[in-house]
């Protein structure tokens, strides 16, 4: 049995290495050993939120695992026979639902199945669920991947309680994604939400984002507002630009003492920054597409080459050898090109 050995402290050395490594192990059937997990972080080793994704992939692939405990700095994952399932991931806190899906989606794309995940939908240090639904899944659909995703309930820090359900069909036709630079913006859209808070919070976030986008661009702006109940209060906004290529996004979370207007402008400014580079994908999307691009092929212009992106490319190439060519420096716009897609 030949192991794929991954140094978990490489590059940005975070949970991304775990998510991509274990997902690729399930897809390829190759066992993976990850050592030095988060070695450069203040609290090294596996965190609870990483375990949720790993255990979901274990269930999906009937895997044998060793070292799957909080604080563990080495993990061995030996996948069994993967089969379509309904995977339930109950995160008791505000652990990120979208980060669990970053681990699950690449593997499930090859198998099919459905999922039900509770936890945080809109939490710091992870993509908001509306970004995943409207920006990431839009790009995946262009590559031939069909995912249905429904946000049943929001979950914010610290209590969580969000619920996201969905299903994914097996990836039949792998379509190369060619999207270097956008040429025109068709329109802007977005979702501004307030949970256990007054409706005016969502409305003010939306108004501020709408006004900021309209200062810079003439394309129409339609931002929906959503007011809901859950375990605890929270607010946030995701805005995206529909271009002739892909969608680029920007987002921001509300917090106590931060005016709703600041939240709305922050999301709009993040999107404007990405659009100004002229590239077809924002920095978060570029990074998220890597495991899928390896199989579909193509080339994508990203608004910023990030450490996350470079690390993710490195993990994919640990499994398949030279797959990508990355043009551009970290911190600058660049291009991601598949030189040898994996079949």
Curated annotation (Swiss-Prot):
The active site is at 308 (tele-amp-histidine intermediate). It is found in: Cytoplasm. NCBIfam families: RNA_3prim_cycl (TIGR03399). It comes from Thermococcus kodakarensis (strain ATCC BAA-918 / JCM 12380 / KOD1). Its EC number is 6.5.1.4. Belongs to the RNA 3'-terminal cyclase family. Type 1 subfamily. One of its GO terms (cellular component) is cytoplasm. Its main location: cytoplasm. The gene is rtcA. ATP binds at residues 102, 284-288. PANTHER family: RNA 3' TERMINAL PHOSPHATE CYCLASE, RNA 3'-TERMINAL PHOSPHATE CYCLASE. Catalyzes the conversion of 3'-phosphate to a 2',3'-cyclic phosphodiester at the end of RNA. The mechanism of action of the enzyme occurs in 3 steps: (A) adenylation of the enzyme by ATP; (B) transfer of adenylate to an RNA-N3'P to produce RNA-N3'PP5'A; (C) and attack of the adjacent 2'-hydroxyl on the 3'-phosphorus in the diester linkage to produce the cyclic end product. The biological role of this enzyme is unknown but it is likely to function in some aspects of cellular RNA processing. This is RNA 3'-terminal phosphate cyclase. SUPFAM superfamilies: EPT/RTPC-like (SSF55205), RNA 3'-terminal phosphate cyclase, RPTC, insert domain (SSF52913). It comes from the Archaea. One of its GO terms (biological process) is RNA processing.
